[in-house]
Amino acid sequence: MRTQWPSPAKLNLFLYITGQRADGYHTLQTLFQFLDYGDTISIELRDDGDIRLLTPVEGVEHEDNLIVRAARLLMKTAADSGRLPTGSGADISIDKRLPMGGGLGGGSSNAATVLVALNHLWQCGLSMDELAEMGLTLGADVPVFVRGHAAFAEGVGEILTPVDPPEKWYLVAHPGVSIPTPVIFKDPELPRNTPKRSIETLLKCEFSNDCEVIARKRFREVDAVLSWLLEYAPSRLTGTGACVFAEFDTESEARQVLEQAPEWLNGFVAKGVNLSPLHRAML
């Protein structure tokens, strides 16, 4: 039997770079919120212990795909602790709607959905803490998707505090470019010393993203989309880009602006949600 699992997008409602560690990783403070929009992952169980991704991504080797890596990591971790039923395997496919290099967390969300779904389907019984710890080895954003609640993140993104920001409507726009995270983090002009503040203080301040100035400078497409959106509503970059978003109080307001969008702007309207659609589906 084939089952389907949500793999939602996320937004960084704010993102501040507070420093850089000796190993090169940047420390940050950011606010994650999910969207009721994303990819859909389909899983059909196998009994021969094999993992197959039926919808390969162009330019990404099968074993390098985060979906396959997540499945194999769960398989190994569960097997090593005697919690993997004999023959556990899966055929996995994905209906991909989230762009790569968009700052919406698509790859991290895919990995988290596979960890959570296969742990359930295989009946491994790993805890949420164990899954989140495994997820961190796949990517800094994976744990927040595993835990499934909007969160204030610190460190390199792995220290999570659940929060409940307002669930607004967003017009999310893709400028048509892909921005690899290292391009932003290696830029010498990236702010790296924003003072650390408490979550209480940050929630009272106007939200912004330290990466935005670099993305706008290096990618004129990002600058053009943000300039257009800012005429209608508070707007900013998510993650390291390339996607940007404008926030609205109602769905109709967001859709009215999208209807006025120039032809070169690709976007969608979605609601911010504090409980991940993946975890809502499991209730």
From Swiss-Prot:
ATP binds at residues 99-109. InterPro entries: GHMP_kinase_C_dom (IPR013750), GHMP_kinase_C_sf (IPR036554), GHMP_kinase_N_dom (IPR006204), IspE (IPR004424), Ribosomal_Su5_D2-typ_SF (IPR020568), Ribsml_uS5_D2-typ_fold_subgr (IPR014721). Keywords: ATP-binding, Isoprene biosynthesis, Kinase, Nucleotide-binding, Transferase. Pathway: Isoprenoid biosynthesis; isopentenyl diphosphate biosynthesis via DXP pathway; isopentenyl diphosphate from 1-deoxy-D-xylulose 5-phosphate: step 3/6. One of its GO terms (molecular function) is ATP binding. It is an enzyme of class 2 (transferase). It catalyses: 4-CDP-2-C-methyl-D-erythritol + ATP = 4-CDP-2-C-methyl-D-erythritol 2-phosphate + ADP + H(+). Its EC number is 2.7.1.148. GO terms for biological process: isopentenyl diphosphate biosynthetic process, methylerythritol 4-phosphate pathway; terpenoid biosynthetic process. The active site is at residues 10, 141. HAMAP family: IspE (MF_00061). NCBIfam families: ispE. Catalyzes the phosphorylation of the position 2 hydroxy group of 4-diphosphocytidyl-2C-methyl-D-erythritol. Homodimer. Belongs to the GHMP kinase family. IspE subfamily. This is 4-diphosphocytidyl-2-C-methyl-D-erythritol kinase. The gene is ispE.
